[in-house]
Amino acid sequence: MHPKQLIPAEITELTSITNTDVADAPSAVEAVAALADFVGGCPVIAHNATFDRSFIESVKGGVNVSDIWIDSLALSRIALPRLASHKLSFMADLFGCDSVSHRANADVDALCGVWRVLLVALTDLPQGLMARLADMHPDVPWSYRPIFSFLAGQNPGSIFSLSAARADVLKADRADDRVDADELPVLKMPSREEIEADYAPGGLVNRMYPTYEPRDEQIAMALEVRDALVTGTHRVIEAGTGVGKSMAYLVPFAEAARRNNITVGIATKSNNLADQLMYHELPKLAEQLDGGLSFCALKGYDHYPCLRKLERMSRGQVEITTKRDPADTLTAVAVIMAYVCQSADGDLDSLGIRWRSVNRPDFTTASRECARRLCPFFPDKCLVHGARRRAAHADVVVTNHSLLFRNVAAEGRILPPIRHWVIDEAHSIEREARRQWARVVSADESRVLFERLGGSSTGALSQVSRDLATSEGSTLCLGLTAKATSTVARASMAIAGVFDGVRELGRRARGGYDNANLWIGPELRESDDWHDFLQSAYTGIDALEQADKSVDALVQAVAADKPEVVVDLGDISRRLHELAENLKLIIDGTDEHYVYSLQVNRRLRAGGESMTAERIDIGEALATEWLPEVHTAIFASATMTVSKSFEHFNHAVGLDRIGASTSSSLHLDSSYDFDSNMAVVVAGDIPDPRDRESYLTALERVLVDAHLAMGGSVLTLFTNRRDMEDLYARVEPKMARAGLELNCQQRNSSPRRLRDRFINEPTSSLFALKAFWEGFDASGETLRCVIIPKLPFSSPTDPLSCERNLREDRAWARYSLPEAVLEVKQAAGRLIRSSTDSGVLILADPRLVTKGYGKKFLTSLPTSSYQRIESAQIGHYLQLWRARHERRR
């Protein structure tokens, strides 16, 4: 059809369609009308049908093409869930079909070939599964139902058993048990000379990577890790960019696991690093080690499908809770069911499920929710406990910080007993531990909890009533159900009143843009507003306790004879109890281990309110609850020191509370030449940020000059949305006139899409917030300049800062200052990601010059090459810097 505009060059390159080809083509309306005549209301098969359908139906007459659209992309995920990719081009090549050329006829030919493969693959799924899928939730319109019904008719009478399917796929899934390192008097380890040989030319690492060149810093780190394992002590290692820290710890840790038949653990913050370990470094290491190396990734409970819930959903025994598109939930059931019938292990993350319209908790469980012995799939057939079992049989387990700290809170019931850990990206673990150990009372989560409880006609209480209705001798239990329904209804209303009070208290909060975060400190607790709030809070606590007692009484009574009936209700009862306990903790506020706060979303008239209790001293908790259980912990990161000192980090993780002889620290410089490749510019004459208009005007000039001088590829990192959006409105039009693209991290924008756009468009620049301060990698010409307008100190009204200031005289210098220094180091680290990268860091906060603490920021950076320049000269400086470095290439 005629596009009514010129075809972009990249589209012509992709499809070979030129402007000449479409010069006489019909209009969109004419083309869609012709398509409707051709289809004649028949079902339409399309790969990613949602895109095609929305595109066609946006044209006048498009809705007349067909009422039934079958998405072969979603169907391929059901038929072949284990494929590495479900792109049409990938499958066409894999199965020898016609190739995809992004031209209509060729792509249709390819889809026809793939379609036949999909139908055959569906018939290869376990007997009876097609009938199970065709019959589930018949009231929900679902385009795949006729296909499954037809295929089920080819094998009538077959009965599907998920339990049998899991037993069949698990036949070969056997492994040897590992020893708990607590049972070993000492670890058998390679000598220092053997470790050095692994990193020498022709050694183990060289065999993994033929172009590998030995690095003194990497060898020093590997030896330090080896010594820590031998002595059963801890290490804090700051390894600059380019040291190769992952290979430095992998080799000695792998040797420890293999030589002692134990499991060792690696915890990362980012998925990128975990994927690098799982799909690149560990497989290569396993290939080169005699006898191989077993490894697995272990994620949180909510990453794995719960087979009990899946079975009940497929049988129609539970309601579909989503209101958005119930058909997507049925598709999710089909995809997951096919996957678990073919895979001994695995998680939900790669299955392509549309979680925006599918309620994830309908398919997952949690540690406290898991039915365990009441579940027919526990433990061997379960994917959650199967993953834990495989982890206990592996040499190396890769997990994340979140799960590690959840395991600490659960007293070791989630992870296998691992006594030797690498905590990579360790600079962020204090924050993550605080988040995982927080006690939260949330309006949204409370609403979902009461929706799950339901009442006389919906939810778990209604389900129990229906299950008991046909049972003999159920009069007592039905009476308990009625009482529970009544107390739950009262509790739901009472807790709603609590959050109405929270929203009123939120009006007292100063600062914040969209979200108010208010410290529940002495001033608030002594106010009339708080005393007014206490009445509704105590009413809510009392109602929650009454509901908890009545639901628990029902669970206990029914569980005596029919425990399977109240599995879900038992979990909800525990959550109801937890809600009451957390609310009491926060309202009482006397436990000095916590700081208390409340949160309100100002953009919403209702909803989004919460109250939180966070652990203040994470180091104390780690020193008493985790480190005593661990023989060796290696804390590694590129950003740990403040002015060359580890004091702040050691306090944050509790190493300063367990004795000086149990740990030591090591700083390793980067193998990259930061002094030659990185420049730091301090804008010396920017007005004080407290004079906001003067500050923004001066900053606007710096931003415009910097972007024009660099020709794009600039990342500006803001500490607050208000400044960012104000400056974007001022700067973006000037960039557009200069032919430069400037994007901004708007409220609903996707960080991933912004990142991809920045990386793929060389002249693109970005204004961004917290998500981009760390973990954002864009090497080479993609990123040549990072600008930090304001030092990232925590807000004066931040509840944790307020609580620390109340308790300690020098809290700001002890906590807020070093935390800000480390954040700036992280941001600076975005610039140099390889030995050939170069870039400029611009610091536009006048406090670097006017305050004594400014030197701490500058002396903590990886280069000593910094200079103060008047803001009017920054553009000229960048032009000279750019010309000099381009000549060097």
Map each language-model feature to its residues.
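A substrate-engagement module of RecA-like helicase motors
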Residues: K4, A181-D182, I195-G203, N261-T263, ...
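A contiguous, basic/glycine-rich beta-loop/short-helix subdomain that forms a polymer-engagement track
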Residues: P361-V397, F405, A410-G412, I541-G684, ...
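Conserved RecA-like P-loop NTPase helicase motor core
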Residues: S671, A683-S694, Q746-V849
